[in-house]
Amino acid sequence: MITDMQLAIFSNVLGVFLFLLVVAYHYINANTGKPSAKAK
């Protein structure tokens, strides 16, 4: 069985990974989109 400590570590690692995935997605999406208004 999974102990409480293993479950806590797993959930924390999963949460950090998903948070970083969302941050990376937004960073990539913001920097590789349509040309900005500054490019005129």
Swiss-Prot record:
A single BP term in Gene Ontology: protein N-linked glycosylation
InterPro entries noted in UniProt: Oligosaccaryltransferase, OST4, Ost4p_sf
Membrane topology field: Single-pass type III membrane protein
Location of the protein in the cell: Endoplasmic reticulum membrane
Domain of life: Eukaryota
Regions that span the bilayer: 8-28
Gene Ontology CC: oligosaccharyltransferase complex
Main localization of the protein described in the UniProt heading: endoplasmic reticulum
Zinc found in the keyword field: no
Keyword terms of this UniProt record: Endoplasmic reticulum, Membrane, Signal-anchor, Transmembrane, Transmembrane helix
Record's function text: Subunit of the oligosaccharyl transferase (OST) complex that catalyzes the initial transfer of a defined glycan (Glc(3)Man(9)GlcNAc(2) in eukaryotes) from the lipid carrier dolichol-pyrophosphate to an asparagine residue within an Asn-X-Ser/Thr consensus motif in nascent polypeptide chains, the first step in protein N-glycosylation. N-glycosylation occurs cotranslationally and the complex associates with the Sec61 complex at the channel-forming translocon complex that mediates protein translocation across the endoplasmic reticulum (ER). All subunits are required for a maximal enzyme activity.
Protein name: Dolichyl-diphosphooligosaccharide--protein glycosyltransferase subunit 4
